[in-house]
A protein has these predicted regions:
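Short, well-structured beta-strand/strand-turn elements
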Residues: 163-172, 199-215
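Short edge-strand/loop segments of extracellular domains
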Residues: 221-226
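Polar, glycine-rich mid-to-C-terminal structural blocks
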Residues: 243, 251-276
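Surface-exposed aromatic
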Residues: 173-183
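Extended compositionally biased segments used for macromolecular assembly or nucleic-acid engagement
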Residues: 131, 159, 169-175
Length: 512
């Protein structure tokens, strides 16, 4: 090998505030150690990272560093203290005096292989922050009013129990009148909400490595890539050990339909939730009740968002009575009601402080309803492409974009880059140990970086943006790097007011 680098798998065995402990010496080398993160696809219209993974095996036999059988089996008496699912885990690579944290996450699966006389190993997989984002459901997060994508993203991340190690959020280009209003708390994950935000902004969100902590959550607005002309690396076919190329009809679209969602907003407060039952509460007890907002005209059938929610008022928003039908003694003053309002649901904490049981005969939530009733589609067609290749339709939803003109602008941009065939370089792979240049490229380049790739057989000689990365520590000690790439030409549009932005309609097209 021309150059070498050292890799470490480390864990925080005493919690997220503790020191990092290396377990590299016990990593089994019968198979590779593999880390993947970022957008693991070159497909167009992919703006959000996939769940990143780190896969490795640990020596669970007496031959490990502790000389203990079961050292990496959580139910074994000799298990390493702190080793279990949820343990923070990272992969770092040190080269030429610099350390790069390529993956940071938490153990998601720990599977000891049973059998005293078999291959005593523990198969491990860690997930990056997107694993938490894919599991955590939005809960009682308020509607975001007149917020950019980065501001809404920050509000979402701040609501989570597990947050990324660090974040770098550029200022979004769109200000959304309303967002987080058309989600459903009970089913919508953070990852799904990130997709809705990015699809509306047309920006990118992924996790990248760095030289500080790794696991950096990054948001690039839709203007970041067109304004980034700095090449981080240049590779040719002599550097590559593998590349994947495609030229398919499925890669082109000649009819583009972008869907915007104008909102209807109540001028004044409406009743968005009414409790349909009359539960009885014993003295000195409490109860939690969750209500979901719906269209007052289609009660319970059409979910809506709610803004400017009003604190519950006795007699108006809640009443309690000794009789189920409300015809007995008014007990409202015996009760307290606290409401936590979200963008599409409310959670009540109701307490009966009295000495007698009572029925909840009225419980309702009032606020300004937000209605997503009539989405508007903006369409663009390339007739010449349709004549040649038939109809290839792309329908794309922009849930928080309420302006059909913005959708029309983006449709006009897409119809300028998608209707003609193109040879798509999807992935490239190279071995870092071949040269200093390649090792440096593999360690420095992260999702969002601009690179130049040349391949003689296919005739490809273009610039690309790296979408996602894969790092493989092979059994033979070499370090393989794989990049998932998207053509930089798809970001070659003109942002008005930027000097040297090329010739409109010749080497670039109007931005949006």
């Amino acid at each position: 090998m021309a150059v070498s680098a050292s890799a470490e798998i480390e864990m925080q065995l005493s919690g997220s505030a503790g020191d990092w402990t290396a377990v590299t010496s016990d990593a089994r080398r019968q198979g590779p150690i593999t880390a993947k993160y970022g957008i693991l696809s070159s497909e167009p219209m992919r703006f959000v990272g996939d769940v990143g993974t780190l896969n490795f095996e640990l020596d669970n036999s007496e031959g490990n560093s502790a000389k203990m059988l079961g050292y990496y089996a959580p139910d074994h008496a000799c298990c390493l203290t702190g080793f279990d699912i949820g343990t923070p885990t990272r992969l770092s690579i040190t080269y030429s005096g610099s350390t790069f944290y390529k993956f940071t996450g938490r153990l998601d699966s720990v599977e000891p292989v049973p059998g005293r006389y078999r291959d005593r190993r523990t198969v491990c997989q860690a997930l990056d922050w997107f694993g938490d984002a894919d599991a955590f459901k939005l809960r009682l997060l308020e509607v975001q009013v007149n917020k950019r994508a980065d501001e809404a993203l920050d509000a979402i991340v701040s609501s989570m129990t597990k947050r990324p190690s660090a974040s770098s959020l550029s200022a979004g280009q769109e200000t959304f009148a309303y967002c987080l209003d058309n989600s459903r708390d009970e089913t919508t994950t953070v990852l799904r909400e990130l997709k809705k935000l990015m699809d509306s902004e047309l920006g990118y969100c992924y996790v990248v490595g760095d030289q500080s902590t790794g696991g950096l959550l990054k948001f690039d607005s839709r203007h970041v890539r067109p304004m980034n002309h700095t090449l981080t690396a240049c590779l040719t076919d002599t550097d590559l050990v593998d590349a994947q190329v495609s030229r398919r009809t499925s890669n082109l679209f000649n009819q583009v339909r972008l869907v915007a969602h104008p909102r209807e907003v109540d001028d004044s407060a409406s009743v968005l939730f009414t409790l349909q039952s009359t539960p009885q509460m014993a003295p000195s007890t409490s109860m939690v009740i969750t209500g979901r907002y719906s269209d007052p005209g289609q009660r319970g059938l059409s979910r809506v968002g709610g803004a400017s929610m009003i604190a519950p008022c006795p007699a108006t928003d809640y009443t309690m009575n000794s009789a189920e039908d409300g015809g007995g003694t008014d007990l409202t003053t015996n009760f307290t009601v606290a409401a936590s309002y979200g963008g599409n649901s409310v959670q009540y904490e109701v307490a009966n402080l009295g000495a007698v049981p009572g029925y909840i005969t009225l419980l309702q939530a009032r606020g300004r309803g937000l209605y997503d009733r009539e989405p508007v589609a903006a369409e663009q067609v390339s007739e010449s492409s349709v004549d040649l290749y038939g109809e290839r339709v792309l329908t794309f939803d922009m849930p928080y974009n309420d302006d059909p003109l913005v959708a029309a602008d983006f449709a006009g941009y897409l119809i300028g880059v998608l209707p003609t065939p193109s040879t798509r370089l999807e992935q490239v792979e190279f071995i870092g140990n071949v040269s200093d240049e390649l090792m440096t490229a593999g360690l420095v380049v992260e999702p969002g970086a601009r690179v130049k790739l040349t391949e003689a057989v296919t005739g490809i000689a273009s610039e690309f943006f790296v979408q996602g990365c894969e790092v493989v520590l092979a059994v033979d000690g070499t370090i393989h790097f794989k990049w998932y790439v998207a053509p930089a030409s798809s970001a070659l549009y003109w942002i008005l007011g930027i000097e040297g932005a090329s010739e409109l309609d010749e080497t670039t097209i109007l931005g949006y």
